[in-house]
A protein has these predicted regions:
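A gly/proline- and charged-residue-enriched helix-loop-helix capping module
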Residues: 93-132
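Metal- and O2-centered redox machinery and metal/ROS homeostasis
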Residues: 2-18, 50, 115, 119, ...
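Active-site loop segments of alpha/beta catalytic cores
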Residues: 119-345
Length: 345
């Protein structure tokens, strides 16, 4: 945690700012040629994540190109599975794979009885390296996946659009699902504590698949576990950002102990700010596809996004989803410059 007044943190806490801070989800990623080169040098995605020097390097790459207002730890929400010895691997054009997914009581019982956060020491070393490079010039956002979102991958075994196994467990064996979520929550608490101890300035919780749940299930199987993590890791001066692709269920979030909500591009920033009675800062929410258009369209998108939040503070400019590999780096440069210029208070 930094003692410096960083623009991002000030806006999240809704203090006086001179312009809107901007950063980009997946800002270190496949749209940057230097990232591809470093990933190839490492020998693959997971080898890159587990190499503290190279993970630091790719974290810094977008900051060398663009005047962004935060660094984002280069990692993945599924590395927490290293605490369970679940052998996470990635394959190009497929994504994450667990060869032995958790689908039965027997599968769960085969995992270690004690979780070992030291299996994530490579993340701690990456954070230390990044903090050294930043030298307090910018804040560093650390992150985790929500227990529900992580569980969807551990149960399905890969990235899927059907979610048949986790939905089946939700209906037929909710007790087993709860035990899996308890395990992930326990590991996530230790992991977040380590990130904060090693210097991250904010924690973001990606509840990417929270929208699969509705009503009481959303509260019971997602928000309940997120709140347990927040309550167990609260650190003064380290704000918590919650992100979901959900287009509904927002009423369930009102009692969550967070500081900022990241929303997708389908929602109106100002309406969301008022819906939550200005309790939370709002992050977002330019449609990523606009970055495929000409500069005049990008500028109009920036103006429209800023105009939907007509308040002096409490907005963090971002995309509605993570940036995609087909975006040209020059378009990002133009976007960031426009946000900085057009958001001056």
């Amino acid at each position: 945690m930094s003692q410096t007044k960083h623009l991002l943190i000030e806006s999240i806490y809704q203090r006086t700012i001179d312009r809107t801070p901007v950063w980009i989800m997946r800002q270190a990623g496949r749209y940057l040629p230097e990232y591809i080169k470093t990933k190839n040098q490492a020998g693959g995605f997971m080898k890159l994540i587990r190499n503290p020097e190279l993970a630091c390097e790719v974290t810094m790459q977008p900051l060398r190109r663009y005047p962004l207002d935060s660094a984002l730890l280069f990692s993945d929400i599924l590395v927490v599975a290293d605490m369970f010895n679940m052998n996470l691997r990635f394959e190009d054009k497929i994504g994450p794979i667990f060869d032995k997914p958790l689908r039965t009581e027997s599968d769960l019982e085969k995992l270690p009885s004690e979780l070992d956060v030291s299996n994530l020491e490579y993340v701690n070393e990456t954070i230390k390296n990044i903090k050294g490079e930043l030298n307090d010039s910018l804040p560093l956002i650390g992150f985790i996946g929500s227990p529900w979102t992580v569980a969807t991958y551990l149960i399905e075994g890969n990235s899927t659009k059907q979610f048949s196994f986790v939905n089946g467990m939700l209906k037929e064996n909710p007790d087993l699902l709860s035990r899996i979520l308890d395990m992930i929550t326990k590991g996530s608490v230790d992991y977040v504590r380590e990130q904060i101890k090693n210097g991250v300035d904010a924690i973001m919780i990606f509840d990417t698949w929270g929208g699969l749940l509705s009503g009481d299930n959303y509260e019971k199987f997602s928000l309940n576990y997120i709140q347990k993590i927040i309550s167990s890791t609260y650190t003064e001066g380290v704000p918590v950002i919650y992100y979901s692709r959900s287009k509904s269920n927002f009423d369930k979030l009102k009692n969550l102990d967070i500081d900022c909500i990241g929303i997708s591009s389908e929602n109106n920033l100002g309406d969301m700010y008022n819906f939550f009675d200005k309790k939370f800062a709002i992050q977002g929410n330019l449609n990523t596809d606009i970055l495929k258009e000409d500069k005049d369209i990008i500028k109009k998108g920036v103006i429209k996004t800023l105009e939907t939040f007509p308040f002096e503070t409490g907005h963090v400019f971002n995309l509605g989803t993570g940036i995609t590999p087909d975006i040209h780096p020059d378009k990002v440069s133009y976007l960031v410059d426009q946000v900085r210029e057009l958001s001056v208070k």
